[in-house]
UniProtKB/Swiss-Prot annotation:
Keywords: Flavoprotein, FMN. It comes from the Bacteria. Its cofactor is FMN. SUPFAM superfamilies: FMN-binding split barrel. This is Uncharacterized protein BH2278. It comes from Halalkalibacterium halodurans (strain ATCC BAA-125 / DSM 18197 / FERM 7344 / JCM 9153 / C-125). SMART domains: Flavin_Reduct. Belongs to the flavoredoxin family. GO terms for molecular function: FMN binding; oxidoreductase activity, acting on the CH-NH group of donors, NAD or NADP as acceptor.
Length: 209
């Protein structure tokens, strides 16, 4: 099948992309409005950008009317956010939080999640997540869209603090088996941590022997 993206609708492109780019990690993001309301929302258009400095990027799609979502607006106005890793223990609550509440209502309270103070940033963290990345906003870039109207806001954050549960921290890294992370697939499907295998990176000398 050969398909030209320019001849497809936004929905058709979206379906192909989320079915082809997977599994995708989930960033469960808390932000805070100027009024002090804590917003929480999951995003799977998310990944690491650089390790030095530690930067992460999240694409936050715009609302149907073209205005920024709470996460992007709060991030730009307050300049901070917290990313929570989604695992098998908290994924149900994360899914509940995706309901589109008005800005003056908190998804944290609606989903029955527990706010705890963050170490460095003013935005609260959530106790239900065993790995948390506290971030300062580096940039918010409007991207995509047609006719001059952006389709999303690309939120770039610099990690200023890692909060990792003691039982997950192993040899300077993360024990993935103990974490049991959850990823997004296509449609309403999610992926669990399952079968893995390792491959040593080849060297030029090995390949020429």
């Amino acid at each position: 099948m050969k398909l030209n993206p320019d001849s497809l609708s936004r929905k058709e492109n979206y379906r192909l992309l989320i079915g082809a780019v997977l599994p995708r990690p989930i960033a469960f993001v808390t932000t805070k409005s100027k009024a002090g309301v804590v917003n929480a929302a999951p995003f799977s258009f998310y990944n690491v950008l650089t390790a030095e400095p530690p930067l992460i990027g999240i694409s936050v799609g715009r609302k149907p009317d073209g205005t920024p979502k709470d996460t992007a607006r709060n991030g730009q106005e307050i300049g901070e956010f917290v990313v929570h890793v989604v695992d098998e223990q908290n994924v149900e609550a994360v899914n509940v939080s995706s309901i589109p509440l008005p800005p003056e209502e908190s998804e944290v309270e609606y989903a029955g999640l527990t706010e705890v103070p963050s170490e460095v940033v003013s935005v609260p963290s959530l106790a239900e997540s065993r790995i948390r990345l506290e971030c300062k906003v580096e940039n918010v870039i409007p991207i995509g869209g047609k006719g001059g109207e952006p389709a999303a806001d690309f939120l770039i954050g610099r990690v200023v603090h890692y909060e990792v549960a003691d039982d997950l921290f192993q040899d300077g890294g993360i024990d993935t088996e103990a974490l049991r992370p959850v990823s997004r697939l296509a449609g309403n499907e999610y992926g669990k941590y399952g079968e893995t295998f390792s491959l040593d990176r080849p060297t030029i000398s090995q390949n020429r022997e």
